[in-house]
């Protein structure tokens, strides 16, 4: 589930501006060792100077997995919220995951559980997926695919 507009609002609420929040993101990336990552916006949409690597995505995902709330969000098929719009009206919204593992549209081998993951798609990045799996012994594995031309193939390759 993505909500680019929500990411921007959260950035402004936390840091006072999107630029200040992006600076915090870049500092945190450096802190966890994601030294080949540079953010220019909070929402992840394409920008020429906005980049990362598979390894840095792993580091960021691994850091996020240390928070129980993040692990819970990864497993959600949908999220419902009620919020107040700028004009004062109450808006009811539902966001649904596009992750085919989470939705149950794609199966995994016996003994493996698709715990959850994050999809991302832009024209420049194409279809991307960072996915957490767990085997029957409880061992966890993070798999990452970037730049897949077709979303359907993304899940076959994973």
Go through each PLM region and give its residues.
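Domain-terminus/edge residues, biased toward the C-terminal soluble/receptor-binding domains
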Residues: 34-35, 49-51, 55-56, 61-158
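Active-site-adjacent loops and short helices of periplasmic peptidoglycan-processing enzymes
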Residues: 1-55, 64-68
């Amino acid at each position: 589930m993505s909500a680019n507009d929500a990411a921007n609002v959260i950035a402004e609420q936390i840091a006072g501006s999107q630029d200040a929040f992006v600076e915090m993101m870049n500092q945190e990336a450096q802190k966890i060792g994601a030294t080949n990552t540079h953010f220019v916006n909070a929402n992840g949409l394409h920008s020429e100077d906005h980049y990362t690597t598979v390894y840095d995505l792993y580091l960021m995902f691994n850091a996020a997995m240390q928070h129980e709330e993040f692990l819970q969000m990864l497993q959600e098929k949908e999220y419902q919220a009620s919020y107040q719009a700028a004009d004062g009206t109450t808006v009811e919204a539902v966001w649904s995951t596009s992750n085919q593992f989470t939705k149950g549209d794609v199966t995994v081998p016996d003994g493996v559980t698709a715990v959850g993951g994050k999809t991302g798609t832009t024209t420049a990045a194409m279809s991307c997926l960072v996915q957490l799996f767990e085997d029957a012994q409880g061992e966890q594995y993070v798999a990452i695919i970037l730049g897949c031309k077709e979303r359907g193939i993304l899940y076959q390759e994973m």
